[in-house]
């Protein structure tokens, strides 16, 4: 378990799992943070768990900041884009590529949206594993 500040200093190739327990501030931040996993070319996972309150809290923090209006507006737009990404049902790889000006016609087949089927997914085992990891780190 690491904070953003700690994570920025990590140069470790064998990170296998990155978990966000709230919405990152922007797509750029998110990509930087999840990019820490799988640097050695091996399989890795990134999880994003959030609630509607995350966006509300961050927008409140932006509004109450002493930053200039143009920066507040930019921060809110970036936050809206991040929330849209998190709530989307489209291929996550394609969404990220599009954000950075790239295009792909094919779905990745690896993200949660590409792997979902018509049936509901029982996330209880995955959630238990995640919560156990969080619990052990405190």
Regions found by a protein language model. Give the residues of each.
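C-terminal helicase lobe
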Residues: 2-6, 10-138
């Amino acid at each position: 378990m690491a904070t953003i500040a700690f994570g920025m200093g990590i140069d470790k190739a064998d990170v296998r799992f990155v978990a966000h327990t709230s919405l990152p501030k922007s797509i750029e931040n998110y990509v930087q943070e999840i990019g820490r996993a799988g640097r050695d070319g091996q399989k890795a996972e990134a999880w994003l768990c959030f609630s509607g309150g995350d966006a509300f809290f961050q927008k409140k923090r932006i509004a109450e900041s002493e930053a200039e209006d143009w920066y507040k507006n930019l921060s809110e737009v970036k936050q809206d884009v991040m929330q849209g990404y998190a709530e989307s049902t489209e291929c996550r790889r394609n969404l990220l590529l599009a954000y950075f000006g790239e295009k792909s016609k094919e779905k990745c087949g690896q993200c949660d949206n590409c792997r979902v089927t018509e049936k509901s997914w029982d996330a209880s085992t995955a959630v238990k594993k995640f919560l156990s990891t969080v619990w052990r780190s405190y």
